[in-house]
Amino acid sequence: MPKKIDAGQILLRSLMLSLSQKNDLEIHLKDITARLEVELPLIYEIEPEEISPACRELEGEIAGIARGLAGHLDLLLPCQAEVDLYSDKLGLSGRLDRLAPGNRPSLIRTGKAPQDGIWKRDRLMLAGYALLLGEKHRTHINQGLVEYPRQALVRAVQIHSVDRARVLRIRDRIRQIKDGRLPDRPDDASCQACEAREICETRHSLASRFF
């Protein structure tokens, strides 16, 4: 069954993707929200009666979001939004939320930020985008951003070589799986609660006969 679209999350993400000016930020965000109330039901499977309450709720938060983002706008703008990146050489591709100044990859997250730093999954995603951007521009991208608009936070993080290497190892594991070879399970794998446990164990058993 398809997962139901969360109108509030789509609205907040679309608001940040539409961010384009530094002046009169609160007015700018309110104007974007009014436009999105009309446009989002045309783009996504969202009914107007779903998006309207989300817009009213967001309008009540915009003043706080604008105050919080005001000190971060130089990190975010000017920018390109929803940038498609692909590398045949690296075997990686993705759609980056925001290409911020200095060719820094930036992710938009509608959930809560961790107490410190960023979530591990986002660190790996930034490392992957850094690899793609680095190859495209023939340079090392050493910093990325994660935006948490609900909390009006923008966190800058260093992208380390260990993160890049981990992305490439994950890529290699995915290639193995696509080729019908399952990589070894780590000792701490959480198999007991996994929905795919029976299928996975069967495939591991079959694979062990040949590899």
PLM region descriptions:
Residues I10-L11, R166, S190:
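Exposed alpha-helical structural elements
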Residues M1-L99, L206, F211:
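Metal-dependent nuclease catalytic cores that hydrolyze phosphodiester bonds in DNA/RNA
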Residues D74-D172:
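Mg2+/Mn2+-dependent nuclease catalytic core
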Residues P2-K3, G134-H140, T202-S205:
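Short helix-capping/linker segments at secondary-structure and domain boundaries
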Residues P41-Y44, I141, A189:
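Short edge beta-strand segments in beta-sheet-rich domains
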